[in-house]
Amino acid sequence: MTPVSNHGVAESIFDLDYASWKIRSTLAVAGFVFYLGVFVVCHQLSSSLNATYRSLLAKEKVFWNLAATRAVFGIQSTAAGLWALLGDPVLYSNKALGQQNWCWFHITTATGFFFFENAAVHLSNLFFRTFDLFLVVHHLFAFLGFLGSAVNLRAGHYLAMTTLLLEMSTPFTCVSWMLLKAGWSHSLFWKVNQWLMIHMFHCRMILTYHMWWVCFQHWDALASSLYLPHLALFLFGLALLTVIINPYWTHKKTQQLLNPVDWNFAQPEAKGDRQERTNGQVPRKKRL
């Protein structure tokens, strides 16, 4: 089965021969390079323009740049995922086997992004001696899942694209964390963004239920089109998201709305220390 071609005469990125492994691997590498570039550009711009960034610890700067990179990927993923969920007639009519060239582009570049994300997270953990189990597991499963979709010409694209839609929360997470570090956690803008982010996490939970429904409704077609290890990986990852990761992150973000603390880097408060703290740190003047 070859990928379904989009209509149109003009040559474009969506009109490439995605049956070619060379094309798909090239776009995966391009995705890695592009998001590495976003990371580097964010560091350069923030170093030059942002006083808050310059005051951060090295590991916080890495997290800042990763948050911005994830936000850019989240915008791409949300747009692609919404179109697959609501607008594309080919994917809507065949949720198990339907393919589109524009989906191949997003699947391959997402593979490159998740490879970058895994490399960055592991290098950061190694250098700074930190470890976030949920984040590591989440991105490992994401990379392996999209790699499986990128190499399998028979795999349908609907579930892969709705998986991308799970990144809908990342732009809000980026804004939340940056404003938190700038000392704006009591501003109306931060609170509105936090409410929207929590809502996005609830939408993620609803979306995972929809993905389970698609799996049950189209089980035979999925089982015949996906390699068994890929299918098992997808189902196990979806189960982790549904039962553990999504509820945990939703709980933590709701806690953060009520108690604006940077729980990624906040140091344990010394016993008897009554000094008021903001964002897990001693309050300091707001700046951007």
Curated annotation (Swiss-Prot):
GO terms for molecular function: ceramide binding. One of its GO terms (cellular component) is endoplasmic reticulum-Golgi intermediate compartment membrane. GO terms for biological process: adult locomotory behavior; adult walking behavior; apoptotic process; associative learning; ceramide metabolic process; cholesterol metabolic process; glutamate reuptake; lipid homeostasis. It is found in: Endoplasmic reticulum membrane; Endoplasmic reticulum-Golgi intermediate compartment membrane; Endoplasmic reticulum. A motif (ER-retrieval signal) lies at residues 285-288. The chain crosses the membrane at residues 26-46, 71-91, 103-123, 131-151, 225-245. This is Protein CLN8. Could play a role in cell proliferation during neuronal differentiation and in protection against cell death. It comes from the Eukaryota. Interacts with CLN5. Interacts with CLN3. It is a multi-pass membrane protein. It holds the Pfam family TRAM_LAG1_CLN8. Residues 62-262 form the TLC domain. Keywords: Endoplasmic reticulum, Membrane, Transmembrane, Transmembrane helix. It comes from Rattus norvegicus. PROSITE patterns: TLC (PS50922). The gene is Cln8. Its main location: endoplasmic reticulum.
